[in-house]
Amino acid sequence: MARLRTGRWNPFAFYRVPVTVVITLIYIALLAPLIVVQHVLPSVPESNPEGLDLLEAWRDLQSLTNGFHPYNSRKNDEVRSWLLTRIDEIISTNAAETLTRHDSARTFVFDDNQSNLTVVESNLGVYFEGTNIIVYVRGQEDDKREWWNEPGLAPSGKGGVLVNAHYDSVSTGYGATDDGVGVISCLQLIKYFTTPGHEPLRGLVVLFNNGEEDFLNGARVYSQHPISKLPHTFLNLEGAGAGGRATLFRSSDTEVTKFYKRSPYPFGSVFSDAGFKLGLIRSETDYVIFEGDMGLRGLDVAFIEPRARYHTNQDDAKHTSQQSLWHMLSAAVATTEGLVSDTSRDFEGRPQGPGKVPSGTGSGAVWFDLFGTAFAVFQLHTLFALSVTLLIVGPLTLLITSIILANQDRMYLFGISVSADDGFASVPLRGWRGFFRFPFIFGSTTASVVGLAFLMAKINPMIAHSSEYAVWSMMISAWIFVAWFLSRIANFARPTALHRIYVLTWMFLLAWVLLVITTVYENRDGIASGYFVIFYAFGTFLATWISYLELFSLPKRSDYANKFSGQISSRRTSLGGSRLLTPNPDFAGQHQEDDEPTESTSLLRSQRTSFANYTRSAEDDGEGDLLSTGVGTDESEARDANVYGYEQPWSANLPKWTWILQFLLIAPIITILVGQLGLLITSAIHQTMQDGSSALAPYLMIAIFTTLIFMPTLPFIHRYTYHIPTFLLLVFIATLIYNLVAFPFSGNNRIKLFFLQEVDLDTGANRVSLTGILPFVDDAAASIPSANGQNISCIPKGDRTECSWESDLIPHVITHPGSGKQQTPMNEWVKYKAIRLEPGRQNTNRAQFKISGLNTRGCLLHFDKPISQFHVAGSATDSRFPSNPSLEDGTEDGVREIRLWSRIWGNEWVIDVEWASHNNNNNNNNDDSDGGKDTLTGKATCLWSDANTQGTIPALDEVIQYTPEWVAITKLDAGLVKGSRSFEV
C-alpha cells in the first residue's frame, strides 16, 4: 500500500484537534463565569455611596434579627418600637437641611394602629388588625395638601411609588433575609431620599408591613390606609431563601421593569415569572396583593436560595452576608430612584377593576440578565413578532436555497448517484449518508439523561438537596460521552461529509417546533419563559443556512460525474485494457445499492464490510485528519488530501473553516442564556422536595437543560478526540456511584421538619408532631426521648408524612416556670362563649361566638361543617377582598375556619356566623335530636408562637436538641402550639 499523504496543518480546519480544543475552551470560558456569578456576590464598596451607610445597615440587621419575631410574639412589639425609633433617628438627622431646601420633601410617618380587614379565600376566613409602619416622603411634584386626613379625598398628580418589606419573621427563624434585608434596605431608602440632593419627584411610600408570614395579612390591611391611594407602582423586597443574590422574581410589565435595568448587578429571568403564571410555584409574596388586588404595577425582588435555611434558625445574620445586603440594597436604590424620577405618564390610566388605583396597563415583558452585569428587557409582542417572522422566513430561506442548489445541479443532499454524459457509469454520491444520525444520537443521549433522572428519583431522590453539582456533573458527563460514542461509531461505520448539514437541519426542525409552541404560549397566555428558544432557532437557522451555502462551492454534479468517468477511462487505458476498474452492469448496480444505505442499514450487508478500507493509524494522529480516499481508485494511488478520511470525494471542495462560524452562532448565546437559566432554576428548586414538591422535577430539569446546553455540539462532536470523553466517562461512573449511595443531608444542608404541638384543653391530651419526608421524619421522631416507647403514628399529610406521639411535656405559654408565678390551669387558656341567635334570612341558623386567649393575639374557630357567612365585630370590609364566600347556602364550599388576629394581647373577638338549615336542604327531614335545631360543632383554638425563651415550649426544645444535626426544625402552622376546646351550638 502506498504511503498516505498529509496536508499542511490548519488550526481552523474541521479536524479533530481544532474541534476538540475550540469547543472545549469555549464551553469552559462560558460556563465557569456563569457558575461564579451564581455563587460569588459583588463586593461591598470600600466607601459609602452618597446617602447610604452600609456599616449602619449591617448593624441594623444584626439588631433586627436578635430573636424570633413573628406577629404573635412579644419580640414583634419590640421590633416595631425599634423600627419607629430608627426611622425617627434617620429622619431627624436629615430633616433640617431637607426642609430648608425643599419644603415639598417633607416626611410623614404613619404608625397605623387603626386599619383592620376581613378576607375570605377558599374555605378560610381571616380577620386581621394591622400594626404597619408607613413612611411617606413627599415628592416635589406631589399634591401639597394633607389629603389623607380628609375622608374620601384622593391625591392628585401622576401617582407615587411604594417600596414594601415585612418586619415579622416566622416563629422558628430570625428573619435575616426573610425579610430583614428588605427591611434594612427600606430604612436606607428613607435615609437616601431624605438626604439633600436626592429628593424624589414622585412621592415615595415605604411600607414596613407586619403579618406577611401568615396569609399576607400586612399587605392586605395596608389597603385600608388612605395613603395606599397614592402609589401607582411598587417594589416588593422579599426573601424566599437565606442569602445569595436578590433575584428579580417577577414583574407586571415592560414599562416598570426597565427601571430595574438601572441596577448595577441585575439578576433574574422572566422564566420565574412564568412559574407563577403557570401555577408551578405555590408560595406567594405581597406582590400578589399589590399587583392583583390593588391594581399597582411593580416588581418582586427576592432571595431564592438556599431553601434549606429558609424559615429556620439559620436564617440569621451569621449565615447571610454584607454582600447579600448590598446586592439587594443597590438594586432597591437604583430601581426606586428611577421610579420616583420618572416624568412620563406611563403609569396613569384606567383602573383594572373596582377600587383599584388608576395605574393603567402595561405591555407584557421579556427580561433576563447577562452574567449579573447587564440586563435585557423588551416587550413581549416584540418577541412574538420576531418569533412569527423566524417561523416563516427560516424554512422559506432554506427552501429557496435548496431550489437554487437543485437548479444549479449542486444539490448533493439526498443524492444517490449521478450519470456521466458518456453514460459510462453511474457515479455514487452517497447523499443519504448521515440523514438518520441525529434522531438516533439525540434520542439516545436524551433518553440516557432522562433515564438517570428517573433513576435518581427512585433510588436516592433527595441527593440533589445537598449535591446538585454532582447531579449536574453526572448528567453532563453522561450526555457528552454517549453523544460522542454514538457519533464516532456512526462516523466509523459510514463516514460522510454530510453529518454536519443533516444534524443542523434536524436541529433547526426541532427548534422550529419548539418555537411554534412557545409562540402559541406568548400569544395565548402571555408566557415569555421560552424567550431563549428564538435565539436557539435563529442561531441554528443561520448555521444550517451556512451549510447549505457551502454546497455552492462544490462542482456541479454532472461535472463531478464527468470528471470521475474521465479518470476511470484514462486508468483503463493506462492499465492496458484491464477490466479491474470497469464496472459491469451487475457491479454498478451492487455499488449503487451499497452506497444508498442509511444509519439503519445492516453493517454486514453484501460482501463489503462497514469497516473496509478504514485506516486508524493515520487518523489517530492529529495531522492524520488530512488523510482521505477517492472512490473507485486503486488503493496504491495517492489519495486527495482535501477529503477527510473516507468521506465522499466530492467533499474536497467544501470550506474547512466555516464550522467555527457555525459553532459560534449556536453555542455561546445558548450556553449563556440556557446555562444561567439552568443554574437559576436549580438553585430555586433543588431543595424543595422537603416541602413536598416532586422529587423527579429537579433531576428532569437538569437533564433537559443539559440537553439544551450541549446539543450545539452534535454537528461537530464526531470530530472530537477520545481524551475528554474518556475522562468524562470516569467522571460519570464516579458521580453516579456517589449520587446513588451518598447521604443527602448535612449540617449545612439540613432537611426541614415541621413542628406542631396540639393540646386538648378539655381533656389535657397533648400531642407533638413532626411532618416531613419519609423515611427521614420517621428516623427523626424515633430519636426524641419523649417518643421512646410511644406508639409513633405516621400518616400521610398531602405530599408529606406526619409522625406524632403523645407527650408529657406541657407547654408553658401562659406563665413561664422561671417567672415564679403560679401556673394557669389548661382549661383557662382559651375562653369562649357560644350563643344561639334568632334564625336569619331564608331560615338560616345563626350564632354568636366570643373567644379570647391568654398571652396570645391569635385565635381561630374551626367548624366541622361549612358556614355560609360570618362577621367580626368592628371589622372593615373591602370589595377588592371578598369577606364572605360566594356560594349557595349549604354547599360544601363554605368557610370552615376563621382566623382571628388582634394587635392587643388577650383580646376578645365577637363573631356572628350563619349556616344553612339542615331542614331546608334535606326535604324537611330532620335527624337532629335538639328539637329541630341544626347544631354547629367545632373547636375554639388559640395559637402561641413565641419560642424566644427556652423552656416556654419544652417539646420544641427537646426536638431541636435531640434530632440529628442534619435536621432543621421549622413551624408547620401559624402557631407552634395550638390549644383547643370543643363547642356545640
UniProtKB/Swiss-Prot annotation:
Biological process terms in GO annotation: proteolysis
Sites annotated Transition state stabilizer: Y310
Residue ranges of the region described as Disordered: 586-606, 614-633
Vacuolar side: 38-383, 460-469, 522-525, 681-696, 748-985
GO terms assigned for molecular function: metal ion binding; metalloexopeptidase activity
Hydrolase found in the keyword field: yes
The species this protein was found in: Talaromyces stipitatus (strain ATCC 10500 / CBS 375.48 / QM 6759 / NRRL 1006)
Positions annotated to bind Zn(2+) 2: D178, E213, H311
Keywords: Glycoprotein, Hydrolase, Membrane, Metal-binding, Metalloprotease, Protease, Transmembrane, Transmembrane helix, Vacuole, Zinc
UniProt-recorded name of the protein: Vacuolar membrane protease
Function of the molecule: May be involved in vacuolar sorting and osmoregulation.
Major location category of this protein: membrane
Pfam families the UniProt entry points to: Peptidase_M28, PFF1_C, PFF1_TM
Annotated Gene Ontology cellular component terms: vacuolar membrane
Cofactor names: Zn(2+)
Glycosites: N113, N116, N791
EC number: 3.4.-.-
SUPFAM superfamilies attached to this UniProt entry: Zn-dependent exopeptidases
CC cofactor note: Binds 2 Zn(2+) ions per subunit.
Domain of life where this protein originates: Eukaryota
Active-site residue list: E212
Major enzyme class: hydrolase
